[in-house]
Regions:
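Domain-level signal for soluble alpha/beta catalytic cores
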Residues: 1-339
């Protein structure tokens, strides 16, 4: 029996698009130039993912900069304290802001616009993502956390609006990327119940298959928390029984692999998409090792409820890394098909 394969969302950036995407995020392209660039990049990403044999694919998330480092540009209610470094190397290089009013995105966060732009490209788009309510104000999250916390209900409404927009436009799978929420639970900053309540509210009224992605962060291969665990996330997922259809979970670290038995408590209503293959590791995981890992996870949740995925972060890589990333995906697909 073959195991279904997917990716988290972002796809690698090709050399012929690197400079143009940098200009897009710098705001030096015209709207027409940006639109043409994003269509060109997404078209290539969709074709590549399909050619590699993935069962589910995205538009590549080329409208995003380092996952969420661009989102302050869509928001009102923030004042920039320190702009991002010209080259983002670590978490202290991203934009820093403070809250000065109601945080909102009158023109949207860009995710629904991206899906509408990409859905009719050759091959279409099988899944689309939106950042979680604590991920959206990342520029102010650590510099003005108490002020951000007071606006969580409004941030949930903002994210919900974006998710519903994607679903209403016809996307088969709508995914919430609750990276910060997952990290806060791992670090003890948030309870599983608190995280689950926020996630469930984000999906209120969303008429599509619902996926949730949780991870420990990755920026140039670096996690953002020290507790590289996955077991605490099961407590979140148990509270989302009947809400979430697919749990796309980072399990690439050996410490997470050792906690796999906890996932026997995953609700029967959910599929587990196990993020086994590590995009950040310079080593190309052999087919044999990936197959062994898939088998071990299948013994926990059952083959019929298991998908396999890479970890998130493809679009944080320079184009010179593409041969390694591509081989990782090829090996994952082969391992999943030959289990």
């Amino acid at each position: 029996m073959g195991i279904r394969t997917t990716v988290v969302g972002s796809w690698w950036i090709h050399a012929d698009n690197e400079q143009d995407l940098a200009r897009h995020f710098a705001g030096t392209l015209t709207p027409a130039e940006s639109e043409a660039l994003l269509i060109r990049a997404a078209t290539k990403a969709i074709a590549e993912q399909r050619d590699l044999g993935l069962d589910d694919w995205s538009g590549g998330e080329y409208h995003t900069d380092n996952f969420i480092c661009h989102l302050h540009r869509h928001l009102t209610g923030l004042e920039i304290i320190r702009p991002a470094e010209s080259t983002i190397s670590d978490y202290d290089d991203i934009t820093v802001a403070r809250v000065v009013g109601k945080i909102d995105a009158p023109k949207g966060l860009g995710y629904a616009d991206a899906y509408k732009r990409e859905k009719d490209l050759p091959g279409g788009v099988r899944k689309a993502n939106v950042a979680g309510p604590l991920d959206v104000p990342i520029a102010a999250l650590f510099s003005d956390m108490e002020a951000v916390k007071k606006q969580v209900p409004g941030l949930i409404s903002l994210v919900n609006r974006e998710l519903r927009g994607i679903a209403d436009a016809g996307c088969p799978v709508v995914q919430l990327d609750a990276a910060v929420e997952g990290q806060f639970v791992n670090a003890g900053f948030m309870t599983a119940q608190h995280a689950a309540d926020a996630i469930a509210a984000c999906f209120e009224g969303v008429k599509a298959k619902k996926a949730l992605h949780v991870c420990n962060g990755t920026l140039r291969g670096r996690p953002s928390v020290g507790a590289l665990r996955c077991a605490p996330w099961v407590e979140i997922l148990q509270r989302l029984d009947g809400v979430i259809d697919i749990a796309l979970v980072e399990v690439k670290y050996f410490s997470q692999y050792q906690e796999r038995e906890v996932f026997k408590a995953l609700p029967n209503s959910m599929t587990l998409a196990a993020g086994i293959v590590d995009e950040a590791c310079y080593w190309i995981e052999p087919v044999k090792k990936i197959r062994e890992r898939i088998g071990d996870w299948a013994r926990v949740v059952g083959e019929e409820r298991l998908w396999v995925s890479t970890s998130c972060g493809f679009n944080r890589h320079p184009s010179r890394n593409i041969p390694v990333l591509r081989q990782k995906v090829e090996n994952m697909v082969e391992a999943a098909r030959t289990l």
